[in-house]
UniProtKB/Swiss-Prot annotation:
This is Complement C1q-like protein 3. Keywords: Collagen, Secreted, Signal. InterPro entries: C1q_dom, Cerebellin_Synaptic_Org, Collagen, Tumour_necrosis_fac-like_dom. Pfam families: C1q (PF00386), Collagen (PF01391). PROSITE patterns: C1Q. Residues 122-255 form the C1q domain. GO terms for molecular function: identical protein binding. GO terms for biological process: neurotransmitter receptor localization to postsynaptic specialization membrane; postsynaptic density assembly; regulation of synapse organization. It is found in: Secreted. GO terms for cellular component: collagen trimer; glutamatergic synapse; hippocampal mossy fiber to CA3 synapse; synaptic cleft.
Length: 255
């Protein structure tokens, strides 16, 4: 019997827990009536109701590992064109192009003696004139050089004093007008093309009765252009057949 108590007492003590703290180990009540009586409420074994209500229903754990990459989304719309890029380096030299067509024949060259051949002269139109002034002119009027010496092509009209172009090209003109003075005045003579002054000359009467006004021009003319000499004040001397005042011109080459 004693041996049985020795074996049961430790087992009963461990199973009773904290609810049997008021019992004395080894008593007859502990052994004979372990379940008798009313158990006192245990404050240690009963949790606080307010504390249980304040606790969260779950506790957040540590951050997990990164997941696997997802699948690629659909292709987006094209973006706006970007600005032009910098100029690249020069490329390699290309292949030579095809040979062009033959050009027109050139002008005749010089002959063995170094002179211009007769064929060259035949390609230039024969246009030239030279005329002198017979009568006196004064004031503001076109000088009519009526003493005609040369008029190749008949492009100069002595009745109007004007040269009229019929072949476009480069022309040379020169004029010399003698002033009739003696009264202390001056004379101005202008070379005009279609009412526009292209050259001017002046003669002044200082201590002498006569003085010259002269000038020269090279002009490009179109068909219908007119060239003439006009007084812009003063008196021009005409010398019968002496040709003190003259007007001349010729074509250099046609277009």
């Amino acid at each position: 019997m004693v041996l049985l108590l020795v074996i049961l007492i430790p087992v009963l003590v461990s199973s009773a827990g904290t609810s049997a703290h008021y019992e004395m180990l080894g008593t007859c009540r502990m052994v004979c009536d372990p379940y008798g009586g009313t158990k006192a409420p245990s404050t240690a074994a009963t949790p606080d109701r307010g504390l249980m209500q304040s606790l969260p229903t779950f506790i957040q754990g540590p951050k997990g590992e990164a997941g696997r990459p997802g699948k690629a989304g659909p292709r987006g719309p094209p973006g706006e064109p970007g600005p032009p890029g910098p100029m690249g380096p020069p490329g390699e030299k290309g292949e030579p192009g095809r040979q062009g067509l033959p050009g027109p024949p050139g002008a005749p060259g010089l002959n063995a003696a170094g002179a211009i051949s007769a064929a060259t002269y035949s390609t230039v139109p024969k246009i030239a004139f030279y005329a002198g002034l017979k009568r006196q002119h004064e004031g503001y009027e076109v000088l009519k050089f009526d003493d005609v010496v040369t008029n190749l092509g008949n492009h100069y009209d002595p009745t109007t004093g004007k040269f009229t172009c019929s072949i476009p090209g480069i022309y040379f003109f020169t004029y010399h007008v003698l002033m009739r003075g003696g009264d202390g005045t001056s004379m101005w003579a202008d070379l005009c093309k279609n009412n526009q002054v292209r050259a001017s000359a002046i003669a002044q009467d200082a201590d002498q009765n006569y003085d010259y006004a002269s000038n020269s021009v090279v002009l490009h003319l179109e068909p219908g252009d007119e060239v003439y000499i006009k007084l812009d004040g003063g008196k021009a001397h005409g010398g019968n057949n002496n040709k003190y005042s003259t007007f001349s011109g010729f074509i250099i080459y046609a277009d």
